[in-house]
Regions:
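Non-catalytic cap/lid and distal C-terminal segments of serine-dependent acyl enzymes
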Residues: 1-124
C-alpha cells in the first residue's frame, strides 16, 4: 500500500510541475522547450530521476546525492522503462554516503550504483 501511495505522490508532483506549472510559465515567458532542465539534491534528485520514467519533457536531468535508497526505488527502476531516451543525464553520489547511519541509509552507495547502472544501460 505504501509503495502505491509513494508512487502516486511522485506522479502528482511531476503532473503538477509538467502539466500545470510549466504551461503557466510558458504562457508568461518565452521558454526554449529544448532547454528545460530538471534536477535536485537528495529527494529532489530522486524526483528528477523519477521523471525520466514518466515524461520526455526535460532535455536534461541531474541528481546530486539522490535519495536512491528510498524504499522500492531501485525495483521501480528495474521494472520500468526510461521514457525520456533523449535526455542528457548527470548523476553524482558519494561512495561513502550514509554508511554510518546504521539504517536504510547504509544502503545508499549500493543503491546509487544500481541506479547509475540501470540508467546507463537503458539510455545506451
Amino acid at each position: 500500500m505504501r509503495k502505491q501511495s509513494d508512487q502516486a505522490q511522485k506522479t502528482l508532483v511531476d503532473n503538477e510541475l509538467f502539466n500545470n506549472v510549466l504551461p503557466e510559465l510558458q504562457s508568461r515567458y518565452s521558454i526554449d522547450t529544448n532547454k528545460i532542465i530538471y534536477g535536485g539534491y537528495s529527494l529532489g534528485g530522486l524526483a528528477a530521476v523519477y521523471s525520466l520514467y514518466r515524461t520526455n519533457i526535460p532535455s536534461a536531468v541531474f541528481s546530486i546525492c539522490g535519495s536512491f535508497w528510498y524504499p522500492e526505488f531501485v525495483n521501480f527502476c528495474k521494472e520500468n522503462p526510461v521514457i525520456n531516451q533523449n535526455a542528457s543525464v548527470y548523476l553524482c553520489n558519494g561512495k561513502t554516503e550514509g554508511i554510518h547511519h546504521h539504517n536504510i541509509l547504509d544502503t545508499a552507495p549500493q543503491c546509487a550504483e544500481k541506479i547509475h547502472a540501470l540508467i546507463r544501460k537503458q539510455l545506451n
